[in-house]
């Protein structure tokens, strides 16, 4: 909201001098990638940070922009689709080193680049329920021969075994659009 207030005078000047008709706020309405499952989704929605909706966002922004007489454009893509997608991957095998445990899965950085590219956090949960005492700290890595091919590092997680499925959550935004067939892997 502060950014909108700061740029509104510039938009008014541009409208007057150049006849602009649109004001694009862009995106930037984030989603929660971490912690949504700690206490349950329903309880999370009662937190203050969860109260930002398109409606509350509009109620905050429109009074500042409406006097400009411009068409307001919002790009809420991630808010709409971010948590609507999950990447399902299978644990191929486990590698236990002296200092680290690795869960090697069949999805790699070509499927979801965010963790490798800019350390984007995604909850990773087993598709089936696990007893809470069956946990391990592990790196979840893909099958691509790259040191950066990881979906999670030093993650406390259920101790899944070979053949079991994991869901990498919040993969709906940019997951597919940023995917590639790197290393001749199918998308």
Annotate the PLM regions.
Residues 60-62, 67-187:
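Charged (often Lys/Glu-rich) extended helix/loop segments that serve as interaction or gating elements
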Residues 1-90:
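Active-site loop/helix belt of alpha/beta enzymes
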């Amino acid at each position: 909201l502060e950014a909108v207030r700061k740029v509104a005078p510039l938009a008014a000047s541009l409208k007057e001098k150049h006849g602009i008709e649109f004001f694009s706020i862009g995106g930037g309405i984030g989603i929660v990638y971490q912690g949504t499952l700690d206490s349950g989704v329903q309880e999370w929605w009662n937190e203050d940070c969860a109260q930002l909706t398109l409606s509350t966002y509009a109620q905050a922004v429109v009074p500042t922009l409406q006097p400009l007489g411009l068409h307001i454009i919002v790009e809420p893509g991630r808010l709409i689709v971010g948590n609507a997608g999950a990447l399902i991957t299978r644990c191929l095998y486990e590698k236990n080193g002296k200092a680290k445990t690795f869960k090697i899965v069949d999805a790699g950085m070509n499927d979801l680049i965010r963790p490798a590219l800019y350390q984007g956090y995604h909850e990773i949960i087993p598709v089936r329920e696990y007893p809470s005492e069956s946990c391990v700290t592990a790196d979840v890595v893909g099958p691509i021969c790259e040191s950066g091919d990881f979906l999670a590092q030093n993650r406390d997680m259920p101790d899944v075994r070979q053949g079991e499925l994991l869901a990498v959550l919040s993969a709906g935004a940019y997951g597919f659009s940023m995917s590639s067939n790197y290393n001749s892997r199918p998308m």
